[in-house]
């Protein structure tokens, strides 16, 4: 299917979603939101897509909301920004978090505002050395959205989350890695190849089990210790009944490469 604001491709078990509004630093307008939602919903249900990569075309990953798509007339009634969050941004973040397969974010250039927090919602973030993350909301008198106030303090701690969100300073990729906010940093010229290699590696793994791991890690933030070990028990019970578990054991015993199906 042809899209105006994104590029969607499938290759070797991986779905590649590229934000494609480079002249606007891949910032979101309503049409782009709708296209992204359509593709991610299709891939969530498609068993042939076993890993998803989200990236941005051009010199930046995503600058968040396209302010030109939301002109504020000082003489008009104030806009309801909560509607945009409820209708578009929150469903997008929930789709990424709940997707039953790994989601990798490849960040080149700037990831600002909602763009930074979309990256944080992904399971693994790989950034180019030139990349940076900016919680730009404070510069406009706004509050971080797209679950930024949930992900950020859990990733970097209270003090650093406060500093990043109150000051709106750029956080360079290598510092983001040192702080535990992202998984890895690579040379700019190697970003695409390194991410594709990692995505294809994950696509060959037992993705049903990986989806249960995602669930366990996400729920650990709010669970008590006792609740978490019970969750591990329940998820392990489910995993142990999967076809992938049987295949993994048989492959190990027979000293061959496993052929996982994601179920």
Named regions from a protein language model:
Residues 34, 56-95, 111, 141, ...:
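Glycine- (often His-adjacent) and acidic-residue-rich active-site loop
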């Amino acid at each position: 299917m042809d899209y105006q604001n994104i590029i969607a491709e499938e290759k070797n078990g991986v779905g590649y979603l590229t934000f494609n509004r480079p002249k606007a630093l891949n910032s979101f307008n309503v049409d782009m939101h709708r296209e992204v939602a359509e593709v991610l919903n299709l891939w969530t249900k498609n068993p042939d897509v076993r890993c998803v990569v989200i990236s941005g075309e051009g010199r930046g990953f995503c600058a968040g909301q396209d302010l030109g798509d939301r002109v504020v007339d000082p003489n008009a009634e104030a806009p309801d920004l909560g509607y945009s969050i409820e209708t578009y941004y929150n469903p997008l973040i929930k789709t990424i978090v709940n997707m039953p397969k790994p989601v990798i974010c490849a960040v080149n250039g700037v990831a600002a505002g909602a763009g930074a927090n979309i990256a944080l919602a992904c399971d693994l973030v790989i950034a180019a050395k030139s990349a940076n993350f900016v919680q730009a909301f404070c510069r406009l008198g706004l509050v971080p959205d797209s679950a930024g106030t949930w992900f950020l303090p859990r990733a970097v701690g209270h003090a650093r989350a406060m500093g990043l969100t109150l000051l709106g300073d750029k956080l360079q990729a290598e510092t983001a890695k040192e702080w535990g906010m992202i998984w890895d940093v690579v040379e700019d010229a190697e970003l695409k190849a390194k991410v594709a290699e990692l995505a294809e590696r994950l696509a060959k793994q037992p993705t049903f089990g990986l989806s249960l791991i995602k669930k366990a890690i996400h729920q650990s933030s709010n669970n008590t210790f006792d609740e978490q070990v019970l969750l591990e028990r329940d998820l392990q019970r489910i995993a142990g009944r999967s076809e992938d578990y049987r295949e993994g054991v048989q492959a190990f015993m027979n000293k061959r490469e496993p052929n996982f199906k994601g179920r």
